[in-house]
Amino acid sequence: MARREEETKEFEERVVTINRVAKVVKGGRRFRFTALVVVGDKNGRVGFGTGKAQEVPEAIKKAVEAAKKDLVVVPRVEGTTPHTITGQYGSGSVFMKPAAPGTGVIAGGPVRAVLELAGITDILSKSLGSNTPINMVRATINGLQNLKNAEDVAKLRGKSVEELYN
């Protein structure tokens, strides 16, 4: 039991959306709840998950478990992203641009949750296209996955970091 308590303290979780869905059967409608949750340690690891259940707390619990299974490591430079990136999923895209220290997280709804839990403190972002919460979260995580540090790029090119900037 103590191990589970430690595990939950490691990650902060944020519920992005809860949706009531209905299945129409012969006797009427059967309602269930879906939950979209983002988890992160505010230190470069973030993930999202969805859960569906008869009750809201149960759906959230399932979503948190799913989110912890699929974490992404986000490269950061002084609290922001190393470079400008656009993440895409479906018809939704999220444009993210590094910002100067003190700017804060300029992002809307689901995108803000992902960026804050990833530990990014200064960033400018704009959501384009589809604004469905799940698509926004997936597009944001897609963009964060495609980020590269200067060290990684230098290694891929077989050069030193100093040579990249000259």
From Swiss-Prot:
GO terms for biological process: translation. GO terms for molecular function: rRNA binding; structural constituent of ribosome. Residues 11-74 form the S5 DRBM domain. It holds the Pfam family Ribosomal_S5. Part of the 30S ribosomal subunit. Contacts proteins S4 and S8. The N-terminal domain interacts with the head of the 30S subunit; the C-terminal domain interacts with the body and contacts protein S4. The interaction surface between S4 and S5 is involved in control of translational fidelity. This is Small ribosomal subunit protein uS5. The gene is rpsE.
